[in-house]
């Protein structure tokens, strides 16, 4: 495996940005996410510069032991370049509290320092309360305000969400609390459509406890449908929240959303909408919230 860490500008404070563990990771992707991170960090108003890192290691299907071994060797090299006042990495796709914990332990062992060098830690060793929910909740509060400004109410809206990770789960939860009905979720193998509204408890059980695929969802909700591959944006909804990964919403998807009368698209993931799709949505009067503003809750509430 190859590890990466890209740092942009630390003139006003330490670099800050996630560590992504996913087979698709390469230098290009990390640079592009890091560049986006500069603007996202500046929008939080906090004194932090842009950075991003990760590796093409795939934690999927690996045992705790294997993940731990990887995280430790990754940190053995990474620790030379980071520090509480230099660069503070965080979680991202494939990197949750478990992985951050393994890395933090290794950093502490090598450097002999118990400091704020990583964010997204568990509560028992210095993490911040509500960090897990921050990105998804922040996305919905942002969306709610954005709709209000445009004279619309999120209450009663039908929503499509892509993804089934940290951002997606809590975005779905908060959307339901605000009175909207979320009918989709997706992962790397396929997507589910639940006409009665996604069951967050079932989703958490599948994704956070069992770390399984969404195919399991039908066992919990027999009324739902599971579809292989892409297609989450083909459902007729009022609001679309891409919360999976970069470049997941293409021009064709944007055309489908517009045809189905979608009112707004708000990004939960980093750069999930392609440039052509973004332009098409804006030309057709769809309210569009870029991720660098809409998902910045994750940076702001990270410890």
Residue ranges and their predicted role:
Residues 1-39, 47, 56-57, 61:
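Generic N-terminal targeting/processing segments that precede catalytic cores or assembly contacts
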Residues 27, 31-35, 68-79, 100-105, ...:
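Predominant activation on well-ordered alpha-helical scaffold segments within soluble catalytic domains
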Residues 32, 86-90, 113-118, 161, ...:
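General beta-strand structural signal in soluble alpha/beta enzymes
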Residues 41-154:
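Glycine/serine-rich phosphate-binding loop and adjoining beta1-alpha1 elements at the start
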Residues 82-85, 152-156, 235-238, 257-264, ...:
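Short, surface-exposed connector motifs at secondary-structure boundaries
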Residues 119-122, 127-236:
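Glycine-rich phosphate/diphosphate-binding loop of Rossmann-like nucleotide-binding domains
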Residues 244-303:
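Rossmann-fold NAD(P)-binding glycine/threonine-rich loop
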